[in-house]
Regions:
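Short, small-residue-enriched loops and turns at beta-alpha junctions
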Residues: 30, 85-88
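An alpha-helical appendage that flanks or caps ligand/catalytic pockets
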Residues: 1-75, 108
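Hydrophobic faces of well-ordered beta-strands that scaffold small-molecule active sites
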Residues: 78-80
Length: 109
């Protein structure tokens, strides 16, 4: 999730993620089963970020995170879920636009 500021991106992600997470474990709950992916997809976005499975921030924060990931692992591509949970169209559009215009160019070769 990319927004103009770290605080704005974090707020949007914190609000949107629970709805997405609820949908992820719906079938497990419906079948009275334990959600087996809870370690990969914890209950809130802060926990998701803490284990390195999510990022929300300004373009600079997201760019720095991806550059660090690339330097540490040699990764040459990432899969991004740009829209999730209860994000509005406007929030999603802004995130995608900022990612395309201010994050991606840093990784073009």
């Amino acid at each position: 999730m990319v927004a103009d500021t770290d605080a704005q991106a974090q707020r949007i992600a914190d609000e949107a993620y629970p709805r997405w997470r609820d949908g992820m474990d719906f079938l497990w709950r419906r079948s009275n089963l334990d959600f087996t992916l809870k370690d990969i997809y914890p209950g809130d976005f802060a926990a998701l970020q803490a284990i390195g499975h999510g990022i929300a921030g300004s373009p600079a924060t997201v760019r720095d995170y991806l550059a660090r990931l690339q330097a540490e692992t040699g990764v040459n591509y990432v899969l991004c879920q740009m829209v999730f949970g209860s994000m509005s169209f406007e929030q999603a559009e802004q995130s995608i636009r900022l990612f395309a215009s201010e994050v991606m160019p840093a990784f073009e070769t």
